[in-house]
Amino acid sequence: MRIFIAFEGSFEAFDVEAHTSVGAIKQMIKDYFHIPLSEDKQGRWYLELMYAGAALRNSWSLSDVGISFCSTLKCFVKKEDKPTLYVFNAVTQEMMPIMENMSLLDKKVSDLRMLVTLRCGFPVSVYCLRTPTGLEMYDCNTLKDYQTDIGTTLRLDVWDGWKEFLMGCLLGQKPKVQHYLSKEGPVLKYGS
């Protein structure tokens, strides 16, 4: 069957089978238009096919999504940026991607900690950042001082005694939080 591909002002016909996968069609488009797709440390370039306003997955076949004879698919070259750094939050067990430009690597650890605080909500004074080898990172040093490169995963560790309090806050456990905030000696020591 014949379908049409709209790409950067061109409108080209392609003869394909109904069971052809979207991934195979992307390869045909890449070869026909000589599109250089690449991947590096900062991101990757890829093709996206759209039909009726929806992005098509590589594994789908044309017949799966109702694409018939003389249908028109739109094709775009898109860039997917990779995070500059990742920060593993030891409290929540979540990985935080840090999507800043590369100049972040030349900045001080304190600048990164401010970004992390804005993302996770933890006060700067309750945690430290560690390198992949476990070395504590000090605010006055630059990220380059710790051989931090694009894609490095750092670890956020909280100081002793803060993990339980922060988890109580994150999970909405009011009695646990009140216990940690109490000024009354018996409640602080023996509360629930």
Curated annotation (Swiss-Prot):
Cross-referenced CDD domains: Ubl1_ANKUB1 (cd17050), Ubl2_ANKUB1 (cd17051)
InterPro entries for the chain: ANKUB1, Ubiquitin-like_domsf
Name of the protein: Protein ANKUB1
